Amino acid sequence: GISVTVKAPELCPRYIAHYVKDVKVAESPLWMRKRLALCGVNSINNIVDITNFIRLEIGQPMHAFDLSTLEGESIVVRRAEDKEKITTLDGKEFSLTSDNLLICDAKKPAALAGIMGGLDSEIKDSTSEVLFESAKFMKGNIRTTSRALGQSSDSSRAYEKGIDTYTTGIAMNRALHLVQELGCGTVTKTGIDRDAKTEPENKPIKTTFKKINAVLGITVQDDTITDILRRLNFDVTVENDSITAVAPPYRQ
């Protein structure tokens, strides 16, 4: 079966992989091609377009591997060995150091983590099995690798701004939903989520309604304040005049 091992959790705190079978690689529907074009992104095929669409819609870069090219049906997230080489999708070959993060199969590199996929594992017209990737890679490492190699992409630029581990799961669910909506594959139950849970928990914010009104300079009813925060997905607790709120992960 498919396995995922994260050997460098300090550079990849969360990695989600999901297997899709019976894949039919084809042109994306017109509505998706139009939306991508409006954002300056060329349509490639339905599978790759799903990953690009999600990056634009949610802000989470994704990648799709042709599963048949992954030795041992394995994903290993690890630091590169000194002078290890990878050829990326654009045909460029890079010599790496241990500062660079790789997505590998059981034997060889399959992608330069967060920057670009490897040439060997790209989605082709004949691809029938896909492994979707949604991950959080640390922005400092992506920036350092991108500058050192002189290689950047839409994905690396998004990662350099910082990605929340919460978004990683949302993006994968959205990708699988689009696979079903476009009818381009069968979503299996084979999904693996490696979460090192290194994200700091959101600290509760405690204050009073009186102080909120003093800062605002207007009077807002207690119930209205509570209602607004709850509609913004804050976890709110009220006790007499004091209010405690915990922000959702994406509002840290």
Where would I find each of the regions flagged by the language model?
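RNA/tRNA-interacting regions in translation and RNA-turnover enzymes
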Residues: 1-252
